[in-house]
């Protein structure tokens, strides 16, 4: 869920967050509202996240740093170790506490159709971000990036 109240935005990640469920978050990152001053990401109910989710969170952190966005990850728990393992923990400010979602819900606005091209583009962008954030991720994800890039091109041709 993505919500807002004036210039404050909140994101609640729940369950198992993966390449299929993180596309709206990538879209939010790529269209970060100019009025955003503060962002809270609540991971209290996030059971697990895959590398695509961690890459999209890293995209958000890097975008936030550039735009001087006050950003914090709440209640990361074991997910913090996952971020640390990929060398991107340094991008985040971690806190514990309660987050009460804001009243204006941006996402989900309704049911969205699964889009293979958007999912593939999300996987590609996320893993490219992980590699640029920490070069040691090249060895981990270089093949993923190359295969996904080919998938994206194939999906574009089939349109």
Locate each region found by the language model.
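Histidine-anchored nucleotide/phosphate-binding helix
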Residues: 55-61
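STAS-like cytosolic regulatory interaction modules
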Residues: 1-47, 62-159
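Generic recognition of short, well-ordered alpha-helical segments
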Residues: 23-24, 52-55
């Amino acid at each position: 869920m993505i919500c807002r109240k004036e210039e404050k935005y909140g994101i609640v990640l729940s369950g198992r967050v993966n390449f299929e469920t993180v596309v709206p978050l990538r879209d939010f990152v790529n269209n970060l509202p100019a009025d955003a001053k503060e962002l809270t990401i609540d991971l209290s109910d996030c059971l697990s996240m895959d590398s695509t989710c961690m890459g999209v969170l890293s995209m958000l952190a890097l975008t936030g740093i550039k735009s001087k966005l006050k950003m914090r990850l709440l209640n990361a728990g074991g997910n913090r170790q996952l971020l640390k393992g990929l060398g991107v923990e340094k991008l985040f400010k971690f806190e514990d506490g309660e987050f009460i979602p804001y009243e204006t819900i941006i996402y989900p606005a309704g049911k969205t159709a699964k889009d293979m091209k958007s999912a593939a583009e999300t996987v590609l962008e996320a893993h490219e971000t992980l590699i640029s954030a920490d070069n040691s991720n090249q060895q981990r994800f270089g093949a993923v990036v190359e295969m996904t890039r080919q998938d994206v091109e194939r999906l574009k041709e089939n349109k």
